[in-house]
């Protein structure tokens, strides 16, 4: 359920004053006979974006309301300010104070992404980044602040590193996600040194199997981590119902 709560059009009839959805089967089928209505074409969401427009397309979202300068479109690039954000759950007490105005909200994270639309897909991003010590940037499959899979570039002791990180509170569906006392954990699933400030990061998802690959400018490919289980990003484990983002 990494794509969250989806909406479907399904047949419905009334029986004894009660609505019955999908009568006869009680489940959604792949297709149903459509009524004879005029076509209403909808503009498809583009598969690629070279960021050469004046404004960001509506399919892209941020985490929180971005402030001026958090990102900009320039020279056919999306330039994002690196902004740290705590990778831990917000307690109900703190959330209540934020909503009442007693505490300021956390800064908008340095993130621009789009919703996961398919169970199997490939996401690719070309990135140029010159990290300082402990700074990171990359490509992430994000459910919330504390459940994610990401390939990131960072700097450690003066060396540029590419690594794949799994972050979570729990990977067990039977453990309630309302337990805010669970510590945030992260696992490094693969890493390697990288000699360039430019990398093409690729995430290939086949169902719940996620493979991250780093590609050099000349096309040379390096698998960073393969077939990582993304099941812990579903709502049963991570909570919520809005689905994952890629960005």
Task: List where the protein language model places each region.
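Extracellular glycan-recognition regions
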Residues: 10, 17-247
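Structural motif
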Residues: 4-9
């Amino acid at each position: 359920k990494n794509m969250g709560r989806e909406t479907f059009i399904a047949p419905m009839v009334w029986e004894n004053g009660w609505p019955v959805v999908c009568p006869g089967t009680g489940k959604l089928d792949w297709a149903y006979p459509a009524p004879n209505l005029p076509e209403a074409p909808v503009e498809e969401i583009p598969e690629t974006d070279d960021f050469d427009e004046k404004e960001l397309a509506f399919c892209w979202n941020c985490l929180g309301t971005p402030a001026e300068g958090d990102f900009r479109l320039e020279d056919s690039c999306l330039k994002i300010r690196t902004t740290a954000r705590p990778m831990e759950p917000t307690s109900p007490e703190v959330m209540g104070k934020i909503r009442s105005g007693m505490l300021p909200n956390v800064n908008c994270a340095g993130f621009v992404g789009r919703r996961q639309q398919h169970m199997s897909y490939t996401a690719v991003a070309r990135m140029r980044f010159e990290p300082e010590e402990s700074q990171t940037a990359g490509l992430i499959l994000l459910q919330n602040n504390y459940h994610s899979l990401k390939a990131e570039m960072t700097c450690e002791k003066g060396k540029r590193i590419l690594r794949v990180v799994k972050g979570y509170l729990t990977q067990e569906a039977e453990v309630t996600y309302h337990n805010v006392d669970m510590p945030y954990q992260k696992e490094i699933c693969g890493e390697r040194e990288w000699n360039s400030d430019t990398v093409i990061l690729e995430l290939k998802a086949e169902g719940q199997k996620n493979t991250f690959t780093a590609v050099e400018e000349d096309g040379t490919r390096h698998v960073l981590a393969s077939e990582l289980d993304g099941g812990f990003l579903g709502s049963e484990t991570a909570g919520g119902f809005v689905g994952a983002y890629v960005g």
